[in-house]
């Protein structure tokens, strides 16, 4: 079973590390090509392209400039411990033990605009380059064209290595668009999290993102390998709704708190 999640905009390079183990990202040659493109942008251009403040644009221009492909624990951090958004609040990787990291390294993948695919212990230098950004590059007009089949091929390699054919899509639409489902050698399962609001169940972005992290943690902690095991997910008040679920879309609901 392979879990896919999105990265986060918020990064943490200060907190104590939960593990000193690390691996190197596998697609750095491609990342380097994107960095070369990004370095051609001025801070105002970055601000317009990403829709961010001048201060953030300056920070990211500096990050692009400082980025270099020789990653060490001194200039980089394990991806699963560097990302700090809503998904990662639910995941709480900083509390993983060695066995959790082992399982996650085999069964969890983070999709990334700059790095393509990251394993949890892959070192990562700080960046901001969302998958949906229209950064022109030698392969096309945006990052989807840049990555082409590369991300899908990497995921197929991971599936081959673990010997099963199930992908649990907990990534956002923006990021999952970088995967080509027809070329993915797997059964695709998408958990959906609905929260009750004024008597109606709907996707509430903040809660849904955190729930994706909670589900990822649930799979990792319990070493789940079969799709039917996912329906037991009951963290923070969610319950499986069999009636509205299908074979490839599992619906979890939570009553208003």
Swiss-Prot record:
Its BP terms in the Gene Ontology are: response to hydroperoxide
Q: Could you name the domain of life of the organism this protein comes from?
A: Bacteria
Q: Which InterPro entries match?
A: YaaA
Please provide, in alphabetical order, the Gene Ontology terms of the cellular component aspect for this entry. cytosol
Coiled-coil spans are none
Q: Which NCBIfam families match?
A: PRK02101.1-1, PRK02101.1-3
Name the PANTHER family on file.
PEROXIDE STRESS RESISTANCE PROTEIN YAAA, PEROXIDE STRESS RESPONSE PROTEIN YAAA
- Could you say which protein family the record assigns here? Belongs to the UPF0246 family.
Record-given protein name:
UPF0246 protein YaaA
The organism named in the record is Salmonella typhimurium (strain LT2 / SGSC1412 / ATCC 700720)
Gene for this chain: yaaA
């Amino acid at each position: 079973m392979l879990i896919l999640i999105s990265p986060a905009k918020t990064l943490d390079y200060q907190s104590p590390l939960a593990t000193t183990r690390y691996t190197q990202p596998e697609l750095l040659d491609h990342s380097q090509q994107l960095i070369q493109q990004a370095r051609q942008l001025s801070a105002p251009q970055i601000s317009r392209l990403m829709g961010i403040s001048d201060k953030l644009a300056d920070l990211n221009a500096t990050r692009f400039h400082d980025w270099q492909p020789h990653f060490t624990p001194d200039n980089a951090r394990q991806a699963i411990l560097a990302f700090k958004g809503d998904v990662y609040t639910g995941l709480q990787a900083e509390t993983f033990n060695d066995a959790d990291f082992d399982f996650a390294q085999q069964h969890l993948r983070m999709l990334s605009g700059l790095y393509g695919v990251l394993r949890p212990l892959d070192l990562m230098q700080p960046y901001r380059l969302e998958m949906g950004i229209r950064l022109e590059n030698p392969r096309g007009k945006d990052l989807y064209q840049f990555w082409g089949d590369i991300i899908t091929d990497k995921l197929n390699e991971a599936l081959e290595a673990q010997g099963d054919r199930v992908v649990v899509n907990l990534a956002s639409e923006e990021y999952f668009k970088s995967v080509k489902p027809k070329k993915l050698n797997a059964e695709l399962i998408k958990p959906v999290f609905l929260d009750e609001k004024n008597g109606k169940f709907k996707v509430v972005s903040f809660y849904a993102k955190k729930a994706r992290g909670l589900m990822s943690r649930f799979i990792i902690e319990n070493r789940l390998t079969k799709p039917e095991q996912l329906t037991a997910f009951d963290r923070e008040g969610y319950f499986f709704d069999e009636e509205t679920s299908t074979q490839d879309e599992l619906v979890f609901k939570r009553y208003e708190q």
